[in-house]
C-alpha cells in the first residue's frame, strides 16, 4: 500500500471506497458536456471541409475551446495566445521530424508531452514560448535516444555521444566551450535544440542554470544505463515511486525557466506535491506498456489494488493544497478519467461505470482517449492546426 502511505503524508483520508469520488461541478457543466459529445467528431470531419470554409471552421473550433476554458475559470485571452503557440509548435515539430528523418510516432509523443508540461501553469503563465517548445523537443529526443536508441541505429549512438560529451565533457559550463562544441558538432536534432537555446535570448546566467538542470536530469535518469541514481528498480515499490517523483521534479525545474515565476524556498513542498501527482498520472497512463515491459509501478497490481490507488490519486488531486480551488483542478480530474476510461480492464467495472455516468463535463462515450488518439495522426492534426490558426 505504498500510495496509501505516501498520500497520508499529505492527507488524513481513507481511499478504499470509490464512492468517495465526487467529481467537481463547474459553471456551464451541461454546456461543456454537450460540446464534448461533438468536439472529437467535429475534428475528425475536418479533412472534408473545403478550403474556402477553413476560416469559419477555425472560428467554430476556437469558439468551442473558449466556451470550455471560460467555464472552468481560465483566462480565455491567455488561452487564445497559448493555443496559437501550441498550434505553431506542433506544426514546427512536424517539420523537425521530417528534417531529421525521425519516427512519426514522436509527433504523438510531442503532442502529449507539450500538454503534460502545462501542469506547471499552476505556478505561472508561460512567458518564453520558444524555450518551452525547445525543452519539450530536447526531452523527447534525449529520452528516446537513451531509452530506445534502436529507433536511430548508428545515428543514435553518435547523438548519444554528443549529449554525453556536451554535459560530462563540461561544454555546457561556460559560453566559449559551449559555442566551440556547437561549431565542431555535426547536425542532428539534439544539436539543433542546443543551438535554439543559444539563440533564444536568455542571459548567460540563465543559460548556465538551464544547462545545469538538464545535466542533473539526464545524469539522474540515465547514468549507468538507467540503473544509476535515478534508475533504481531493485529498491522496491517505494524507491521506484520516490525516484520517479524526483525525476519528474527535476523535469519541472527545467520548465520553470519558461514561465513567469520566481522560485521560492517555501514552494518546495508544492513542487514535490505537483511532481507526485504528475508522476502518478503518468504511471496511470502507462499501465498497459509497463505491464508488457514487466515494470513495477503502483498501477501494475491487480484490479482491486489499482482501483484503490486510483481513488487515492483522485483524493490527492481534489485535496491538494496546490490544486484545490484552482481553475485547473477540473482539468486534472478530466485527464484522470480519460486515462481510466482508456485502461478500463485494469480497474473494477463499477468504478469505471461510476466515472462514465457521473462525469459532469465529458461524455466519455464520444470524448475519450481512443477517439483523441485517432485524431492525433500527423496529417489530420496538421490540417486541424492550420485551420485553427486561420
Where does each model-flagged region fall?
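An N-terminal, globular interaction/scaffold subdomain
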Residues: 41-105
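Acidic, carboxylate-rich catalytic segments that either coordinate divalent cations
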Residues: 3-7, 344-390
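All-alpha helical catalytic cores of prenyl diphosphate-utilizing isoprenoid enzymes
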Residues: 82-140, 144-148, 181-291, 330-334, ...
